[in-house]
Curated annotation (Swiss-Prot):
Belongs to the ATPase epsilon chain family. It comes from Psychrobacter arcticus (strain DSM 17307 / VKM B-2377 / 273-4). It holds the Pfam family ATP-synt_DE_N. The gene is atpC. Gene3D superfamilies: ATP synthase delta/epsilon subunit, C-terminal domain (1.20.5.440), F0F1 ATP synthase delta/epsilon subunit, N-terminal (2.60.15.10). It is a peripheral membrane protein. This is ATP synthase epsilon chain.
């Protein structure tokens, strides 16, 4: 089976380094799938789930809050603003953060505060979708 090297790095840590057979991520233009032999590219990532199929067939689900995906002939690099494995996300805390963001939207009239609440809400929704994808694959 053909593989390529992959590194997934956040500002805090390296989450993954090894051989993969496939990576699926949420780009700004939609979902993008990377297989060995993919054309080189650089694209921005939007918040959401990233699925990585390792060379031994295991699948990892990772939440990224945004970042950059670079594809080279034998290497995929993800530089994420924030990245966490789906099983490490705390669903109850995320639901609470979503409720707080929704409440902020109701109570705010300031454009800056509304934009901050919308960003927080979008991040919470993306994290919850990542958790659902992780649970559905198990």
């Amino acid at each position: 089976m053909a593989t390529l090297q992959c590194r997934i790095v956040s500002a805090r840590e390296e989450l993954y380094s090894g051989e993969i057979s496939m990576l699926i991520a949420s780009g700004t233009e939609g979902e993008i799938g990377i297989l060995p032999g993919h054309t080189p590219l650089i694209t921005l990532l939007k918040p959401g789930a990233m699925r990585v199929q390792t060379s031994n067939g295991e699948e990892e689900v990772i939440y990224v809050s945004g970042g950059v995906l670079e594809v080279q002939p034998k290497m995929v690099t993800v530089l994420a603003d924030t990245a966490m494995r789906a099983h490490n996300l705390d669903e109850s805390k995320i639901v609470e953060a979503r409720k707080k963001a929704e409440q902020m939207l109701v109570n705010q009239s300031d454009t800056v505060q509304i934009n901050a609440a919308l960003a927080s809400l979008a991040e919470s929704v993306a994290q919850l979708q990542t958790i659902r994808k992780y649970k559905n694959r198990a």
